Amino acid sequence: MKRLLNPTRLRLDWLRRSSIDVTTAPHVPVLCDTAIEYLQPVPGGTYFDMTFGAGGHTRRLLEKCPEAKVYALDRDPLAHQLARDMSESEEFKGRLIPLLGKFSDLPKLFKEHGLAKNSVDGMLFDFGCSSMQFDEAVRGFSISRDGPLDMRMDGGHSGGVTAADVLANVEEGDLVKILRMYGEEKAAKKIARGLVDARNALFKIETTKQLADIIENIMDGGTRKDKLRRPAHSATKTFQAIRIFVNNELNEINYGMVLANEILRVDGRLVTITFHSLEDTIVKRHINGNVLAGAANALPLKYSSHYAIDEPDILESLTKKSWKQLHRHVIVPDADEVARNTRSRSAKLRAAVKTN
């Protein structure tokens, strides 16, 4: 029998060799120049890079505006180490402050650094996994690289369940919901049934290759077409769904948008980069003012009847917008950028200014 990979040992090996030089970090920032153009950094301004990754956007911002200051947040310890290394370099010393945590950790970090609400000049979100996370097999995000089925964006820094834990314990009905809600998977029932059968009859699913191979067998093939008619592995949506569930990504995105409204000053600028419709829908509804009780409304505005609401507070929250979008149509990479960096092909950028 093939010996299964040891996730703990591989994770320790990854941590030991994770001292990557920030100048050669394997990440090409998406829509970088456009993002910085919309942020419009000014001397003395304070900015938050909410998803530091390998630091491409932060580097460009600080190069464009040497007298600005950036707080660099990331939940990934490797990204945090890259931010620390960058902050200690002569070029960026005193201008870059690394922060380790999720979006929901920001209020605590804000207090620790003596920052006030309504004081920040700009915030940038580059949602989803970083290239570093996809490229490191030991992180468990990649279909094409075999590794332990982990998928935790924080690398286990704060504990939490792994993707393998989810698949070992989730009920079939709940797995169907996860695949439909977070992966927009039309074959959710078929895949969930097959995964539970494999779990019950064979073994605990512990590696990315095992999961990808099982789904390939369930779907009678390894590829199919995505929404844009591009070839995609039949396990792509399942990987996305489980990753989003493990990391509580959509709730974190929603909370990040709420925090942006609290932290930015009036006329402060927000730039977001999303990579699939679930992320973009949350961002779009916040910017359009379609928010109820601090959360993106489940219904688009065109399906919401304001005339049926008699609660003044709720009506005000629906009609009072906090953002003005800075462009008419969503911004996507041009053909040249997609050719240079294929991972940018599904990116969407939105930029807005805080109005109240």
Swiss-Prot record:
Question: Which Gene Ontology BP terms does the record give?
Answer: rRNA base methylation
Q: Report any Pfam family annotated for this entry.
A: Methyltransf_5
Its Enzyme Commission number? 2.1.1.-
Q: What class of enzyme is it?
A: transferase
**Which InterPro entries is this protein grouped with?**
RsmH (IPR002903), SAM-dep_MeTrfase_MraW_recog (IPR023397), SAM-dependent_MTases_sf (IPR029063)
Q: Which residues bind S-adenosyl-L-methionine?
A: G55, G56, H57, D74, F103, D126, Q133
Q: Which UniProt keywords apply?
A: Methyltransferase, S-adenosyl-L-methionine, Transferase
Q: Name one GO molecular function term.
A: rRNA (cytosine-N4-)-methyltransferase activity
A GO cellular component annotation here is:
mitochondrial matrix
- HAMAP family under this entry? 16SrRNA_methyltr_H
The Swiss-Prot or TrEMBL record describes its family as follows: Belongs to the methyltransferase superfamily. RsmH family.
The protein's job, in short, is: Probable S-adenosyl-L-methionine-dependent methyltransferase.
In Swiss-Prot or TrEMBL terms, this protein is called Probable methyltransferase-like protein 15 homolog
Which species is listed as the source?
A: Drosophila melanogaster
